[in-house]
Amino acid sequence: MAHKKAGGSSKNGRDSNAQRRGVKRFGGQEVLAGNILVRQVGSKVHAGKNVGTGKDWTLFALVDGVVKYEKYIRKNRVKTRVHIVPAEA
């Protein structure tokens, strides 16, 4: 005969790991070629000059230089674009 009532079970109690998305290098920061600038889903921030786009929409620097973000209007919407201003040799 049990001396304690059985505790109920729950189907909850789990959580997935965070995706760690977002801006990794901000405007004015110096970067090296290959540095990740933005991790994102979809093209929230667009690639500008000297910036490449990965298959998961990750933006990365193609050259050494300084990060520069800009806003521009496209089809009556304000969009964001990121460029790398190359470092002077």
Curated annotation (Swiss-Prot):
Q: Which GO terms describe its molecular function?
A: structural constituent of ribosome
Record-level GO BP terms? translation
InterPro entries xrefs:
Ribosomal_bL27 (IPR001684)
- GO CC terms: cytosolic large ribosomal subunit
Tagged with keyword Ribonucleoprotein? yes
Q: Which keywords does the record carry?
A: Ribonucleoprotein, Ribosomal protein
Chain spans, region Disordered:
1-26
Q: Which domain of life is it from?
A: Bacteria
Looking up PANTHER family in the UniProt record yields: LARGE RIBOSOMAL SUBUNIT PROTEIN BL27M, RIBOSOMAL PROTEIN L27
Query: Which family does the entry's similarity section mention?
Result: Belongs to the bacterial ribosomal protein bL27 family.
Its name, as the record gives it, is: Large ribosomal subunit protein bL27
